[in-house]
Amino acid sequence: MLPLILDQLQEAGVRPDNVRLTCAIGLHRKNRRDEIVDYLGAEAVSRVPAGNIVNHDAEDPEWMVDLGRSTLGDIVQVNRAVIESDLTISIGHTAGNPYGGFSGGYKMPATGLTSWRSIASHHSPGTMYGNDFVPATTSSRFRDQLTAIGAKMETAMPRPFFSVDAVLDSRSRQLGVYAGSIPEVEQASWPLATARTDLRLDIEPADVLLIGIPRNFHYGAGMGSNPILMMQAIGSSVVRAKNAFVDKPIVIAASVCDGWFNRSEFPPYEEAYAMLQTCQRPADMRGHEERLATDPEWIYQYRHNFGYYPFHAFSMIYMGGIAREHTSAVYIAGAKEPSFARGMGARTTATVEEALHEATDILGHKPKVIAVPELSKPAFHLTATRS
C-alpha cells in the first residue's frame, strides 16, 4: 500500500523531503534500518530521504507533545509529527487482537504514537480486569479509551487522520483494503474482519485449552522462554478463545520456559519479574510502575539500544494476569526451569500427558480439549455454539 500512497502524494505535488515515515512502535523496541527495509520494501524506502524514516520515540523531549486528557480522563501525550503535519496517514491492518478485538483504527495512533503514561491508562488492571475486556471485543472500555485518545489528538491536528487499513487472512494476504477517516474505516472493515476472525465451533464449551508456545514469536526472540511473555501469550489465548470454554477452564501450555529473558531486547524484564515475586497478584504491580518505567538506564536502552520500554513489561504482566482471573489452573508442561513458571502462578509438569491427567483429576471427568498448536498465528477468536 505504501508505494501506491507515495505515488498519489507525488502526483499531488508533495516532494519526497516533505514526507516523513514514522514507525508507530509505541513501547516496542525500535526497528533497525534493515528491518525497516524488510517491512516497507526497498523501493518505497528509496523514495524517502533516509533522515525522514524514523521510529517513534516515546521519550524524545523534542518530539513529544502533551495534549492534556481525553474525554475519558486519560493522559494524551503524542508524537509532535502528528500535530504539525498537514496530513497524517495511518497505514495498518484490521486483524484479530486480544487488546480491543482488532488492530488498526484508533488503536494504531493511541498505542503506537503515544507515551508510556498514555498507554498505561488502558494497558492496566483498571481496564483489562473489567468485565468487558474478555472475550476479545470492540465493545469495551479499552476500545472506548483508544477512541477517546485518538479523538483528542485530532482536535489538535490540522485535519483528522486519513486511515488505510487492510483485512488480512491467516497467511497475511489482503482480503480487503479500506481508506478514509478512522471511524469510517473501522465501520467498513470490522464486518469483514469479524467474518475472517470469528470461528464458530459446533461443540459444547470445552474444559481445557491446550497450546504450544514456541521460543521465538511475535514480540521477538525468547518470547516463549521469557516467563512474563510466556504467560502473556497464555492470557492472550484465553481472551481470544474464552467463548469456546466453560467459565473457568484449565490451560495447558507446552513451553521450554528456561528463563532466558533475552536481556538485549527486553532489558527491564528480569527486574520486573523479581518485582512480581513480591506481589500477591499481578495487579499489585501498579505500585512499581513509576520506579521502573522512569528508570534512566532502561529508558536509555529503549532510546538507543533497541530495547523494549520498561513499562512494556508491566502491560505484559497484566495480560498474563488474565489467565489467573479467568481460569481455574494454568499448567506449563516441559519447562526446563520450572521455578520461573511457578513464579508466574502456573503449575508445572514434565509432560502434556501428565498435565492432562491432573486436569482430569481436578475436573472429575475426562476433559473436552481444544488444541491450538500454533498459538495465535491464525488469530482466530473461538466460540462454541452448543450450550
Which residues does each PLM region occupy?
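Membrane-embedded hairpin module used as a gating/binding unit in multi-pass transport
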Residues: V134-G220
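An acidic, phosphate/nucleotide-engaging active-site surface
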Residues: K30-F102
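A short, acidic, amphipathic alpha-helical segment used as a generic capping/interface helix at domain edges
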Residues: E184, A188-R200, A233-K242, F306-R324, ...
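Structural motif
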Residues: I89-I91, D207-G212, I252, I370-A371
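Mobile "lid/hinge" segments at catalytic clefts and subdomain interfaces of large enzymes
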Residues: S90-G96, S103-A151, T155-F162
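C-terminal catalytic subdomain
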Residues: G224, I228-Y331
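Alpha/propeptide regions of enzymes that mature by internal proteolysis
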Residues: L2-L21, D38-V65, I182, D247-I250
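Extended hydrophobic packing segments that form well-structured cores
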Residues: Y318-S387
